[in-house]
Amino acid sequence: MVPHVPEGCSVQQQLVCSVIPPLNSERRKGQAGRVGIVGGSAEYTGAPYFAAMAALRTGADLVHVFCHPSAATAIKAYSPELIVHPTLDAAVTCLPRLHAVVVGPGLGRDVEASWMPTLFNRIREQGLPVVVDADGLFYVTQNPDLVRGYSRAILTPNAVELDRLYRAVLGSPPRENAVPELARALGHVTVLAKGSEDIISDGHRLLRCTEQGSPRRCGGQGDLVSGSLALFAFWSHSAHDTPGEASKRQNSEYGPAMIAALGAAMLVRRCGRLAFQKMARSTLSSDMLAEVRTAFSMLFPVD
């Protein structure tokens, strides 16, 4: 079914609306998105929770969390809506059941070195969109070949992570055009560089997210981006890959990964603004999560 693209929206809003699948009673559980979150350790249980709940609130039907055994009980207790696997290894075997994957939130940096290539190779074999964030970016910095040349990979570095990754891949400090340069050097993966202005590039094109955000910088906001982004990536690639859909013609200028990154950036920025209007300095990521429904309806009125 062709997505509804509402009139009166900005060009960026229309771009994202064109890949969002319409809701209808004919769909079965799981068809709107099954997302996997690979992350969670003894110290960090909140990060995978926020990523997972962002995916659910954005519209995913099912979300699996694959975490260290020490994190599983806490994450299970946070929400009964999440399917929690108390082992990272389960992520590899469950990939055929998923539509998109997030690697990194709260993962920690002591994962066995040989396991990461196995995970990313299987993701490539399945053709799954993969969002790499937080500790996942640490492993990509150590081994850029994990994502090199994979067009369905989306990296979401903050300023510090971008600096480290750029130096590791290009061997010099970041320059003014660091985002498209990094994307090209990694074989045209998509990079969503988070900052005062979110910059998105696949090395061919560049988008700037102009949506106003929040001055509050509480922990967990990046996890909200990565979780919602995984679902947007599934939707966008599905729209792009479906023959005959109008969205495929409309989105020819920008690749599906870039459109997905734009959607997630806009959504979380609007959530931050709405939450800050209510909570000011007390704003937490949980407050932003509570604004997903309102922000989505305001930005992407497709239903």
From Swiss-Prot:
Keywords tagged on the record: ATP-binding, Lyase, NAD, NADP, Nucleotide-binding, Phosphoprotein
Presence of keyword Ubl conjugation: no
CDD domains: YXKO-related
Keyword Endoplasmic reticulum set for record: no
Reaction(s) catalysed (UniProt annotation): (6S)-NADHX + ATP = ADP + phosphate + NADH + H(+); (6S)-NADPHX + ATP = ADP + phosphate + NADPH + H(+)
Described function: Catalyzes the dehydration of the S-form of NAD(P)HX at the expense of ATP, which is converted to ADP. Together with NAD(P)HX epimerase, which catalyzes the epimerization of the S- and R-forms, the enzyme allows the repair of both epimers of NAD(P)HX, a damaged form of NAD(P)H that is a result of enzymatic or heat-dependent hydration.
NCBIfam families in the record: yjeF_cterm
Name of the protein described by the UniProt record: ATP-dependent (S)-NAD(P)H-hydrate dehydratase
